[in-house]
Design a protein with these regions (language model features):
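Short, conserved DNA-binding cores of transcription-related domains
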Residues: 1-101
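Active-site phosphate-binding and catalytic loops of NTP-dependent enzymes
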Residues: 50-63, 153-165, 177-182, 359, ...
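Short, amphipathic alpha-helical "recognition" segments used to contact nucleic acids or chromatin
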Residues: 109-121
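Acidic/histidine-rich catalytic cores and adjacent linkers
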Residues: 286-412
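Conserved beta-strand -> loop -> alpha-helix junction used to position metal-binding or nucleic-acid-contacting
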Residues: 235-242, 247-283
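DNA-recognition alpha helix
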Residues: 125-136
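RNase H-like nuclease fold core
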Residues: 86-91, 98-104, 137-138, 146-238, ...
């Protein structure tokens, strides 16, 4: 329907009658609320006319079997505050508006705004204060919980959605959240899987919580991925997760396990005093940036000569995990960066930390999952295809062409 600007101006003029001088922000909000009320009520009257099949006072309504029967007030909450709408009724009680459903109490966009604030990490109290300050609307903690609980249905659908048959790389990482339990606050790990599919597209495959971590837990996670359609994974990048090697060997026996270089660096710097962190990080870089595995071994020896007496624990960490830290040396430089430079993991961690920082702790693991899902949904919408992925595809074709074809064929 085309908007008649002349009629709109007339509506504005009528609404502003008796208002001397320029409008301030508060007056403009009141005016917009009045106009919104008129727009909704006009649309509702139009719905009733459509259902009855005749205009008000039209003789066609005589002996039609139904007629208009006044209005009833309905209080709605929206971005402009509280609106009391006069909803038209019919005598038979058959009229059920589509614009505003029978039991609806919030206007379109109200819930989305609340969920958006929740996703940014705002607490229930912050959301209440925001709606009161901006819109003059009181929202109860129960309402906020009701609205955000609707997100769990989306979480369940997302967590069970079908996945791609083949993932070239899957990163498994853990996020730490604080959960209130029996009057105490406990650290709980939420495990996240990020996959790069055969077309070079990144996605978060799922979230899982567990009080304990081991082969049984990880086998359950990997079995879930298989049940959702994953046929094969070429490389799995992990952070020394307990029980994972046994689980991956059972679920995806041909997958290559690569310990995450970023996490190895982070674990190394955990031992270093603040003043020397930059220098130590710079001296670790030649190890994982070496051209070959033997050269990397020489660089580790050089690092040990310089820092071993003070930070022998770092040298031990790299030596004891050497076999799972170095598989990426089998691949060319352009593919190595994709494997060990886990930008997707780091960007996800950064986004999630911002969201949970203001929350303090969560009343349950489910509440944490809601917030993590919303933060992830907003982030992944911005992710692009991996740069230089065509070269990576060609390399994977050389080393695992039969596996790739088999997985893609099974998923077709």
């Amino acid at each position: 329907m085309k908007l008649d600007l002349n009629n709109f101006d007339q509506l504005m003029d009528e609404a502003m009658k008796g208002r001397p001088g320029p409008l301030d922000e508060a007056s403009a909000t009141v005016l917009m609320r009045q106009m919104m009320k008129r727009i909704y009520e006009r649309a509702l009257r139009g719905e009733l006319t459509h259902q009855l099949g005749y205009e008000k006072h039209d003789v066609a309504g005589h002996r039609s079997g139904n007629s208009r029967n006044g209005t009833s007030p309905k209080t709605m909450k929206g971005e402009l505050g509280t609106l009391v709408l006069d909803v038209p009724r019919d005598r038979n009680g058959d009229f059920e508006p589509q614009l505003i459903a029978k039991h609806q109490t919030r206007l379109l966009g109200f819930d989305d705004k609340m969920i958006s604030m929740y996703a940014r990490g705002m607490s229930t109290r912050d959301i209440q204060a925001h709606f009161q300050e901006m819109y003059g609307v009181e929202v109860s903690p129960g309402l906020i919980s009701e609205v955000t609980n609707e997100v769990m249905e989306a979480v369940k659908a997302w967590q069970s959605r079908p996945l791609e048959p083949l993932y070239a790389i899957v990163y498994l990482d853990a996020l730490i959240v604080k959960i209130r339990h029996d009057g105490r606050v406990e650290n709980r790990a939420v495990f996240v899987a990020i996959g790069i599919d055969w077309d070079g597209k990144k996605d978060v495959l799922g979230l899982w919580t567990s009080a304990t971590e081991g082969a049984k837990f990880w086998l359950g996670v990997l079995t879930e991925l298989k049940n959702r359609g994953v046929k094969d994974i070429l490389i799995v990048c992990v952070d020394g997760l307990k029980g994972f090697p046994q689980a991956i060997e059972t679920a995806f026996p041909q997958a290559q396990v690569q310990c995450c270089i970023v996490h190895a660096i982070r674990a190394s710097l955990h031992y270093v005093n603040w003043k020397e962190r930059r220098a130590v990080a710079a001296d670790l870089k030649p190890i994982y940036r070496a051209a070959t595995e033997p050269q990397a071994r020489l660089e580790l020896e050089a690092f040990a000569s310089k820092w071993g007496s003070k930070y022998g624990s770092i040298v031990n960490l790299w030596n004891s995990n050497w076999e799972t830290l170095t598989p990426f040396f089998e691949y060319p430089e352009e593919l190595r960066k994709i494997i060990y430079t886990t930008n997707a993991v780091e960007s996800l961690n950064s986004t999630v930390r911002k969201s949970i920082r203001t929350r303090g702790s969560f009343p349950s693991a489910e509440a944490a999952l809601k917030l993590l899902y919303l933060a992830i949904r907003n982030l992944t919408a911005k992710w692009d295809t991996i740069q230089g992925w065509k070269d990576a595809m060609n390399r994977f074709r050389i080393t695992a062409g039969d596996r790739i074809d088999a997985a893609l064929a099974l998923g077709a």
